[in-house]
């Protein structure tokens, strides 16, 4: 799977989780329904999901502050910005990837490193240690 397809899978898993479904069931069903995904793909997707869930409260407060919806895409976007991932490789708009960046996402991704630290605050300390 390409990185954008892995990201799109993580987005759909997070959306189901935010709808109140059990995470273990979601992951199990996703694995059964996507047999083409290799073990490294499944591991990458799980890592994205669990990394985001560890800091969900902080990411949620950033989204609320910016008056943005709280959904899988928004959480994955913040994760990608926080880890300085190449957003154009992730939000490709191609067949299996998430749609291209919105205007808000493009503007938000331009913030400086200092602003990222200010926005994310405590999460930086959490992830460093």
Model-predicted segments: where are they?
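Class I Rossmann-like S-adenosyl-L-methionine
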Residues: 1-129
